[in-house]
Amino acid sequence: MDNLVSSKRPDISFPVGYHDLHPNVSINFQLNRFYGWVGDDSMLTEMRQAVAGVNDYPMFTKIILELGEKALTRLEVLKGAYYLRLAEFFLPSGDPRKLPTRQRFVDLLLDHLQVAPSVYSRIPFGTGWLPAYRLTPMKPRGTLVVFGGFDSYIEEWLPAALFFRDAGYDTILFEGPGQGAALELAHLTMSPDWEKPVKAVLDFFRLDAVTLMGFSLGGGLVIRAAAFEPRVRRVIAYDVCPNMLEGMLRSVPPPGREKLHECFGSGNEDAVNSFVAGAIAKSLLLEWAIQQGLHNTGLKTPFEMLKHYQKYETASISSRLTQDVLLMAGAEDHYIPVHQLPDQITTLTHVRSLTARLFTRAEQAQNHCQVGNMGLAFRLMNDWMTGLGPIERLPAML
């Protein structure tokens, strides 16, 4: 029996269009990102008017929290929930509003989408646990395991999980170390050894042949996991992320970027920390990236955090992959430079098959994780999995 009720669940749709809502590229992206899960055009007018002229995170979060409360008062639950998530996204880790706002978002979304408590599990891992949701159709045609990246709460992705569940896939969402509840509640910090949480999830659910998808930073982590976990038979990098450090340093405006590269490359810790302290005052994107990176790694300084993220690369292990692989990228991704798509392609020298897809402005899918036309991305993944047919089981071990 389908383990995600009910017949009263709201219809899920994904709007098409990337909108100019704020002149700051980072804020504008996040406004579009969370609108993309709701699709209520009234959000566009509300957000554009409310954040006009706002150029600091404290005021931005105050305004978005107010929009969320107003939406909930009007019983616009999905809109209100994602407004809360949008505001929480920019709240620093020490803010007392952060965890309560996160929990309200989760509770509201689960209730609105009619997600039954029985689909939720806590998977033992290290000194803590990993949260997971399993959404199973009546007659599954395969298993899809999904995780996020640098800043994700997996609940945000539930509308997409419903899409794949309704397409016939036994769909499992989980958070690994440094993500969502695994970080905030179980206190597990980010680790590049992603085959370990994937192994824990596959063991817990007794799975032997899956498609594994990672989104955002997860597009690099999924390559790492697939290199060492043979039960991963198909791989989706949504989007590619073969070099996380390059993406992080890209958030530094030029020409300071070159100076930071030089200081970091020479191992000058004091110079890196001093430079970052000054640079974040000039870049909202960098301010957020450093704040989030320190939070999800549990490290104390920008230098330590950048050294940690230097380990998040795929060039050294990509040749180990022998699976079917789908790589995706946005032509105008402001986090991940587009050259990382061919970079990743050239290192996958032993895969069974390789499909790469670059999304463009003409499709309104040119941005990170195809924000602006996420439905197109989800349909592509579904078509790719369908086209490959059923996964062949591995021979039984003697």
Question: Where do the language-model regions lie?
Answer:
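Hydrolase active-site cap/lid region
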Residues: 227-306, 329
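Short beta-strand/loop motif that positions the catalytic acidic residue
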Residues: 321-322, 327-329, 333
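Alpha/beta-hydrolase active-site loop
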Residues: 156, 187-208
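N-terminal cap/lid segment of alpha/beta-hydrolase-fold proteins
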Residues: 64, 94-139
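Conserved alpha/beta-hydrolase
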Residues: 164-181
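Catalytic histidine-centered segment of alpha/beta-hydrolase-like enzymes
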Residues: 91, 360-376
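Short alpha-helix in the alpha/beta-hydrolase fold that links the catalytic acid
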Residues: 160, 323, 337-347
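Catalytic histidine neighborhood in serine/cysteine hydrolases
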Residues: 346-366
